[in-house]
From Swiss-Prot:
Tissues expressing the protein: Widely expressed.
Region span, Homodimerization: 210-413
Membrane topology: Peripheral membrane protein
Subunit structure: Homodimer. Interacts with GGA1, GGA2 and AP1G1.
UniProt name for this protein: Coiled-coil domain-containing protein 91
GO biological process, one term: protein transport
Keywords on record: Coiled coil, Golgi apparatus, Membrane, Phosphoprotein, Protein transport, Transport
A GO molecular-function annotation: identical protein binding
Residue stretches in coiled coil: 130-209, 249-407
Function: Involved in the regulation of membrane traffic through the trans-Golgi network (TGN). Functions in close cooperation with the GGAs in the sorting of hydrolases to lysosomes.
Residue ranges, annotated region (Disordered): 1-26
Region (GGA1-binding motif): 1-16
One Gene Ontology cellular component: trans-Golgi network
Protein's gene: CCDC91
Length: 441
């Protein structure tokens, strides 16, 4: 601690003499560990101080800490100073109140050496004794202050050494933590690379499985298309044979009845057949378009729902496969339509040729016999025509029903194959998705 932390203060006390003597200044100079303030006034209610000079020696045992720490110590210092006053002067000042004005003074060389200038009173020998005692007490207090300063410096040195040790330990701890963090980062990178490698292996396996499934699906579609084409060809042949037999029977039964009405009936039948075929073709086209639209919408919805779960590579593969299958189905349907149209045109040409041949033969044979029986046979021919029209309508309805049933079977097969394909893809995607969070954890 520096000397500036303590201030030296002087106070002049005046005492009234009972014999009319001049007022004398007290040689006692109080000293205490006060900060530099303008002035300190003792309260008027402080008790009167009457002390014996014999007790002055016992006050030197006061500790320096008690004097420095609290305002009570300042009062003790004032009491120490007041003990040095001669008893005669203290008795004269019992009824007076102390008004001590303290002024900060600069420290001089004498203060650094532990001495303070005191006001001497040559007339009173007791004042000299009290000054000597004060100097002794001040020297003891200065010694104690020096000791406390040395202790403070020693404590500061201990604190600095402890702080240095703390910094060293903190640096070592931080280095250990950094090394642990680096090891954890290396381990994390290794695990991440392992996880990426496993994901790549799973993706490769998934692509291979998808390629195998696509090949199987293509083979199944080709076999189903071949079977359908063969079945349709057989049905067409059987229907043509049935129609040929029926036409032959009708021609044999009506070769004597038909002459002039055959042309009109033929035209009517042709128109009706054309209308029926047009209606049938339109209905089939509408049904096929509706079915294709429904299948497209279902396929789109299924692909959209599956695409949300799949990754980009799987999405591209599935979409390409679906588009190829759509194109193949459309091509197959177009080929079937073309085949049906060509076969139907051939059948119509054959039927018309046979009808024309039979008509020409019958005309030559029945020109003479038919003219007389035309009126009688008109009613019968009308009834027969109506029955034939009804039969043809029934046969066309049955044929349309069979075609619808076959189309439904084809659609069900294609939808079942698509469902199998999508279920396999979903299972593979779910397996991939289930393995990813486990690897991440």
């Amino acid at each position: 601690m520096d000397d500036d932390d303590f201030g030296g203060f002087e106070a002049a006390e005046t005492f009234d003499g009972g014999s009319g003597e001049t007022q004398t200044t007290s040689p006692a100079i109080p000293w205490a560990a006060f900060p530099a303030v303008s002035g300190v006034h003792l309260s008027p209610s402080s008790p009167e101080i009457v002390l014996d000079r014999d007790h002055s020696s016992s006050i030197g045992c006061l500790s320096s800490d008690a004097i420095i720490s609290s305002p009570e110590n300042t009062h003790a210092a004032n009491s120490i100073v007041s003990q040095t006053i001669p008893k005669a002067q203290i008795q004269q000042s019992t009824h007076t109140h102390l008004d001590i004005s303290l002024f900060p003074l600069g420290l001089t060389d004498e203060k650094s050496n532990g001495t303070i200038a005191l006001v001497d009173d040559s007339e009173d020998p007791g004042a000299n004794v009290s000054n000597i005692q004060l100097q002794q007490k001040i020297s003891s207090l200065e010694i104690k202050l020096k000791v406390s300063e040395e202790e403070k410096q020693r404590i500061k040195q201990d604190v600095e050494s402890l702080m240095e040790k703390h910094n060293v330990l903190e640096k070592g701890f931080l280095k250990e933590k950094e090394q642990e963090a680096i090891s954890f980062q290396d381990r994390y990178k290794e695990l991440q690379e392992k996880h990426k490698q496993e994901l790549e292996d799973m993706r490769k396996a998934g692509h291979e499985a998808l390629s195998i499934i696509v090949d199987e699906y293509k083979a199944l579609l080709q076999s189903s298309v071949k079977q359908q084409v063969e079945a349709i060809e057989k049905q067409y042949i059987s229907a043509i044979e049935k129609q040929a037999h029926k036409c032959e029977e009708l021609l044999n039964a009506q070769h004597q009845r038909l002459l002039e009405m055959l042309d009109t009936e033929k035209e009517l039948l042709k128109e009706k057949i054309k209308e029926a075929l047009i209606q049938q073709s339109q209905e089939q086209k509408e049904i096929l378009e509706k079915c294709l639209e429904e299948e497209r919408q279902r396929n789109k919805e299924a692909l959209v729902s599956a695409a949300k779960l799949e990754k980009e590579a799987v999405k591209d593969a599935v979409l390409k496969v679906v588009e190829e299958e759509r194109k193949n189905l459309e091509k197959a349907h177009a080929e079937e339509r073309e085949l049906w149209k060509t076969e139907h045109a051939k059948d119509q040409e054959k039927v018309s040729q046979e009808i024309q041949k039979a008509i020409q033969e019958q005309r030559k044979i029945s020109q003479e016999t038919v003219k007389a029986a035309i009126i009688e046979e008109q009613k019968r021919s009308e009834k027969a025509v109506e029955e034939a029209v009804k039969r043809t309508r029934d046969e066309l309805i049955e044929y349309i029903k069979e075609q619808k049933r076959l189309d439904q079977v084809i659609r069900q097969r294609s939808l079942s194959s698509l469902e199998l394909f999508l279920s396999c893809a979903q299972k593979q995607l779910s397996a991939l998705i289930a393995t990813e969070p486990v690897d991440i954890e």
